[in-house]
Every structure is written in structure tokens, then in C-alpha cells.
């Protein structure tokens, strides 16, 4: 198993929870202490949870099943896409479309449409269409790619769903539970760990914490087919620190990436709206128009 230590977790700010007044009492068993109005997460329990989740993901992938990485909030999008691609798995970073798991047959139609448009452009079909028709097809392709590009090659339901921010991804969690797919998720002190098969207590806002957790799950996937093992997390994080972060992520959001809790003030909690679980379309138009 890839190495992860308390030091790794501390350096990534994994131990920082939310303000005490924002806590979910169901997270009580994962909380070590309270300092200056901030809950501190018990990292020994985080280590244990990581090991359990890591082993489960590795076993699942070894059995021939896939992992779906889900993280649609701004801090997680870049890392989720990067790590899922690194280990050859699927991901959702734009928004979760209702029915991605519970109505996968409809989603597959959208995926087929996406691939059909790509083939049309490659095989020269576009050359025989009007500019208006080509523009319409490219617009449709861009929309499908944005929403479904990360699962383009997903032929069947995944064996595991890995989630960053359970409060935001409520529909994904509900769908996974409905179809019986095990859920691995990072749960912060303001989250409800119930219903999560493999909850990992930790900071789900800091970019470095998100990166660490996602790297570990990607490593588990890769180790399933790598008898020689992988690089330790310290080296992976050195590589990550050299990457340029998305400038659209504010410094305020990165503020949780400190190790001195006395100077730490978490960002105000965001409220997330939940779309209709059965809505497999955007609010204003169909995913695959004109058919």
C-alpha cells in the first residue's frame, strides 16, 4: 500500500474541520478536539479509514470493475480529472446529471450521440453539411463533452464511487445507494457520514487535502495492476506542488491549507441546491437535442 503518514495529513491540512457551530453531531466519533472554535479531526481514525477504503478499491479494481471519481466543486475539479485520468478511470467534475447511475441506459444514449458527432467530424461528414448544421452539431458536442466527457468510455456502472464533498453530491450518493454501488467519500465535520460505506474523515475544502485523498484512491486503482507498487505520497505531493493551481480558486479557499489552527478561519459554508434526482437534462434544454 502507498505510504501515508500523520505528517502527510498535517501538512495537507486534513485535520481542520469547520467551525464548531456548523458541525454535524453524527461526526462526533471522528473529532479529536476543539480549538478556538474549530473542530480538529482525529487523524488516527483518518489513517484507519484510508487503509480500509484503499484496500476495498484495490480489491474492486482487481475484480475487473471501475471507479467513478466525483467532485464538482471548484477546488476539486482539477485534481479529480487529473487523478482519474492518471489511473485510467472515469470522473464527473462539471455537474451531476440526475440518472447517471439510476438511469444509465438514457445516459448511454447521450454517450453514443457524443461519439457519433465525433466520428462525423473525423470521417468528413461535416464537409457535406451546411455551416449552420455544423455549428449546431459542434454546439451539441461541446455541451455533451462538458457534462459527460469524463465518462465517455464507461460501458457499465462502476464498482465504486469516490466522492469529495458529500453535502454537495447528495444526488450522486442517493443514486449510488439505490443501485447498490459502494461509496468512498471524504466527510468533513459538517457532513453526515451515515449511508457512506467507507467514510474518510477529513478536510474536504483545502486543495492539498483534496489532492492527497484523490491521489490515494488513484494509487489504489493503479496498484491493483502493479505488483511493483507505487511511489510514496511524499513524492507524489512534491510533484503536485510543482503544478500550477487553477487561478480561479481564491486564496480564501486555499486558506485551509495551513497547519497553525490558531490562525485558521474557515470559509463560510456554502449552500448547495439539489436538482430533481430524475432530471437527466439541463434546466433549459435536452442533453442530446434534435433526435
Swiss-Prot record:
Compositionally biased tracts (Basic and acidic residues): 249-259
A Gene Ontology term for the protein's cellular component: cytosolic small ribosomal subunit
Molecular function as annotated in GO: structural constituent of ribosome
GO biological process: translation
PROSITE patterns for this protein: RIBOSOMAL_S2_1 (PS00962), RIBOSOMAL_S2_2 (PS00963)
Compositionally biased spans, kind Acidic residues: 238-247, 274-291
Keywords, sorted A to Z: Ribonucleoprotein, Ribosomal protein
Region (Disordered) location: 238-291
Family annotation (InterPro entries): Ribosomal_uS2, Ribosomal_uS2_bac/mit/plastid, Ribosomal_uS2_CS, Ribosomal_uS2_flav_dom_sf
PANTHER family: 30S RIBOSOMAL PROTEIN S2 PROKARYOTIC AND ORGANELLAR, SMALL RIBOSOMAL SUBUNIT PROTEIN US2M
Family assignment from sequence similarity: Belongs to the universal ribosomal protein uS2 family.
Protein name stated in the entry: Small ribosomal subunit protein uS2
Organism: Treponema pallidum (strain Nichols)
Amino acid at each position: 500500500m502507498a505510504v501515508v503518514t500523520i505528517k502527510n495529513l498535517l501538512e495537507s491540512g486534513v485535520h481542520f474541520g469547520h467551525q464548531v457551530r456548523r458541525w454535524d453531531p453524527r461526526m462526533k466519533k471522528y473529532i479529536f478536539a476543539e480549538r478556538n472554535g474549530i473542530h480538529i479531526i482525529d487523524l488516527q481514525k483518518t489513517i484507519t479509514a484510508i487503509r480500509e477504503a484503499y484496500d476495498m478499491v484495490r480489491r474492486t479494481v482487481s475484480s475487473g470493475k471501475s471507479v467513478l471519481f466525483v467532485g464538482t466543486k471548484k477546488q476539486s475539479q482539477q485534481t479529480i480529472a487529473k487523478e482519474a485520468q492518471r489511473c485510467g478511470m472515469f470522473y464527473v467534475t462539471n455537474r451531476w446529471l440526475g440518472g447517471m447511475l439510476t438511469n444509465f441506459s438514457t445516459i448511454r444514449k447521450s454517450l453514443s450521440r457524443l461519439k457519433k458527432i465525433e466520428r462525423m467530424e473525423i470521417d468528413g461528414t461535416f464537409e457535406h453539411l451546411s455551416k449552420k448544421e455544423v455549428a449546431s452539431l459542434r454546439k451539441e458536442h461541446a455541451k455533451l463533452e462538458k457534462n459527460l466527457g469524463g465518462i465517455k468510455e464507461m460501458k457499465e456502472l462502476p464498482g465504486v464511487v469516490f466522492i469529495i464533498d458529500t453535502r454537495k453530491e447528495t444526488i450522486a450518493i442517493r443514486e449510488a445507494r439505490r443501485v447498490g454501488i459502494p461509496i468512498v467519500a471524504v466527510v468533513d465535520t459538517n457532513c453526515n457520514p451515515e449511508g457512506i460505506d467507507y467514510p474518510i474523515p477529513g478536510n474536504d475544502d483545502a486543495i492539498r487535502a483534496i489532492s492527497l485523498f484523490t491521489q490515494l484512491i488513484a494509487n489504489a486503482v493503479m496498484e491493483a495492476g502493479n505488483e511493483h507498487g507505487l511511489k510514496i505520497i511524499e513524492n507524489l505531493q512534491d510533484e503536485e506542488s510543482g503544478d500550477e493551481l487553477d487561478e480561479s480558486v481564491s486564496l480564501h479557499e486555499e486558506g485551509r491549507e495551513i497547519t497553525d489552527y490558531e490562525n485558521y478561519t474557515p470559509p463560510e459554508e456554502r449552500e448547495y441546491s439539489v436538482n430533481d434526482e430524475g432530471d437527466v437534462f439541463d434546466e433549459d434544454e435536452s442533453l442530446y437535442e434534435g433526435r
